[in-house]
């Protein structure tokens, strides 16, 4: 497939990852359509013959099936990148039924409707940080899936259904198990993203509450590296359909806080620490498959990535 000749649909185009992806794809002159429940952010390129925006929620795909068919046909949509979700990880624990309905069932309907209306390939943004559980060794794509929260379980179920539907309807699918993305364009006053949240709280002397062990490790990926992983996935024609996408490195929460303290020249205020959760295990992703199959590799190390994010915030 030549992505330059076929249209690409992105859901969740107004989000952090969506905006970065759209900017890259418009620059490459790839015909592009974005679905989002919000209007197009002013920070994105102007709409054009090659960049279209629809206020359309994937939750409504069955109710608006005729409109979906017309959009897919009009823009020759052959590939869909599904970023949109209705749930943050921390919210899913108290909203299991809503999570299942909106982030499993609605996805199944959306995928089926897309394949049946001419789409050939769906790339799904899964979660490398929540589908595996925790360990002190890197997770490969073939390891057992042991999600500990509903958010991770819904990702696992969606991956499985996507693979099944693609096979049944002669389509292709890719699930990218993404670590913790961060970088330029990310809100630091939001509810998502450890690095921007820590930057905001340390900058403003707001206490940081630690849930779990402060020695637990996480994998963080800079947004430009993540965008390139999606671009490689657009062109990929191989047989693998699941890829871990991370930095290949990990850092403890304690070390991350110390790093940000040094860069801001401010001490963090540590508030609540959960004394029950003392397990220092965390999430480290083995990214060798993505490097070998997609021809992709991360290029931004964490220290430089945090510098880039801080600089972008100060330039606003």
From Swiss-Prot:
Deletion phenotype: Cells lacking this gene produce semirough (SR-type) LPS with only one O unit attached to the core-lipid A moiety while the wild-type strain produces normal LPS.
Pfam family, one: Epimerase
Pathway(s) the chain acts in: Bacterial outer membrane biogenesis; LPS O-antigen biosynthesis
Enzyme class: oxidoreductase
Binding site for NAD(+): 16-17, 155
Keywords (A to Z) from UniProt: Carbohydrate metabolism, Lipopolysaccharide biosynthesis, NAD, NADP, Oxidoreductase
Family to which this protein belongs: Belongs to the NAD(P)-dependent epimerase/dehydratase family.
Record-given protein name: dTDP-4-dehydro-6-deoxyglucose reductase
Provenance organism: Escherichia coli
Taxonomy of the source species: Bacteria, Pseudomonadati, Pseudomonadota, Gammaproteobacteria, Enterobacterales
């Amino acid at each position: 497939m030549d992505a330059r000749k076929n249209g690409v649909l992105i859901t969740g185009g107004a989000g952090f990852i969506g905006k970065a992806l759209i900017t890259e794809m418009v620059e490459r002159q790839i015909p592009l359509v974005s679905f989002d429940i919000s209007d197009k952010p002013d920070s994105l390129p102007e709409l054009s013959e090659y960049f279209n925006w629809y206020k359309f929620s994937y939750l409504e795909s069955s109710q608006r099936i005729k409109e979906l068919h017309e959009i897919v046909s009009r823009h020759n949509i052959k590939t869909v990148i599904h970023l949109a979700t209705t749930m943050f990880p921390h919210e899913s624990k108290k909203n299991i039924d809503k999570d299942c309905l909106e982030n499993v069932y609605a996805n199944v309907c959306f995928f089926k409707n897309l394949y049946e209306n001419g789409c050939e390939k769906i790339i799904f943004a899964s979660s490398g940080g929540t589908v595996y559980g925790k360990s002190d060794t890197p997770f490969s794509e073939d390891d057992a899936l042991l999600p500990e929260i509903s958010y991770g379980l819904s990702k696992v179920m969606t991956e499985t259904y996507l693979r099944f539907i693609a096979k049944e309807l002669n389509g292709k699918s890719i699930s990218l198990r993404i670590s913790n993305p961060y970088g330029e364009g990310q809100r630091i006053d939001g509810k998502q993203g450890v690095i921007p949240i820590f930057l905001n709280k340390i900058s403003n002397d707001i206490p940081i509450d630690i849930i779990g062990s402060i020695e637990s490790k996480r994998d963080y990926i800079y947004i430009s590296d993540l965008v390139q992983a999606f671009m490689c996935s657009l062109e990929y024609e191989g047989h693998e359909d699941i890829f871990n996408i991370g930095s290949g490195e990990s850092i403890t929460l304690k070390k991350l806080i110390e790093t940000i303290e040094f860069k801001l020249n401010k001490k963090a205020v540590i508030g609540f620490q959960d004394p029950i959760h003392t397990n220092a295990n965390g999430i480290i992703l083995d990214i060798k498959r993505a490097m070998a199959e997609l021809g992709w590799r991360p290029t931004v190390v964490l220290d430089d990535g945090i510098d880039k994010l801080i600089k972008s915030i100060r330039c606003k």
